[in-house]
Design a protein with these regions (language model features):
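Pyridoxal 5′-phosphate
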Residues: 1-222
Length: 222
């Protein structure tokens, strides 16, 4: 992000970063990073849905224009009565995330390693993206062998077949296609997320359910 931000500034443009998935999971330094705008979402950190925040740096203040006009709330950028209870809850959620950041990050990395080690025994299971340059809690996994169908796990594991912001589309993920997958491989991809309340038992149970489904559900898998 710092490298991209520096390049953007050299061309006089503003740099916005969507930090919804990263906040509370990776270190963010707005004091040093050349970022002009950064957006956050409360529910990604166990806060309420329907509330977020936008960091506006000094370079962006004079160029940002209001889209909702009226009473001039929120520094004149977004008029309308403030949702005080949601704002307070978001602040509390972010404070808790900051307080337990190091502890939770270490736990999530340990659980992720446990999950990946066990999934490595499943033929054709592939981790999408970089193994190191990634957020720690979310995994995109493609099962390229057999007749894998994610519907086989619907009754036992909470997972996603796409990003939440793209869930209404039946088209293959353009991100997976850009990574080199074809449409069939993209359809055999699931996303698993680890969180504050995930346990080792959850990891072991999920892997066992996936293995069992591979072996006992030929109509769906192979």
């Amino acid at each position: 992000i710092p490298a991209i931000g520096q390049t953007v500034r050299e061309h006089g443009a503003l740099f916005h970063v969507d930090a919804a998935q990263g906040a509370g999971k990776v270190a963010i330094n707005l004091t040093e990073w050349p970022v002009d705008l950064m957006s956050f979402s409360a529910h990604k950190l166990y806060g309420p849905k329907g509330i977020g925040a936008l960091y506006v740096g000094p370079r962006a203040e004079q160029r940002l224009q209001a889209q909702i006009h009226g009473g001039g709330h929120e520094g004149g950028l977004r008029s309308g009565t403030l949702a005080t209870h949601q704002i307070a809850a978001m602040g509390a959620a972010f404070a808790l995330a900051a307080e337990h950041f190091a502890e939770e990050a270490a736990t999530i990395v340990r659980l992720r390693s446990r999950l990946l080690k066990q999934l490595g025994a499943i033929a054709g299971c592939c981790l999408n993206g970089s193994a190191t340059q990634r957020i720690p809690h979310t995994l995109s996994l493609t099962f390229s062998e057999g007749e894998f169908n994610p519907a086989a796990l619907l009754a036992s594991i909470a997972f996603s077949a796409t990003s939440a912001c793209n869930s209404a589309s039946n088209a293959p993920s353009h991100v997976l296609l850009a990574l080199g997958h074809d449409a069939l491989q993209a359809s055999r991809t699931i996303r698993l997320s680890l969180g504050r309340f995930t346990t080792e038992q959850d990891i072991d149970q999920a892997v066992q359910l996936i293995k069992t489904a591979c072996a006992s559900a030929p109509a769906f898998w192979q």
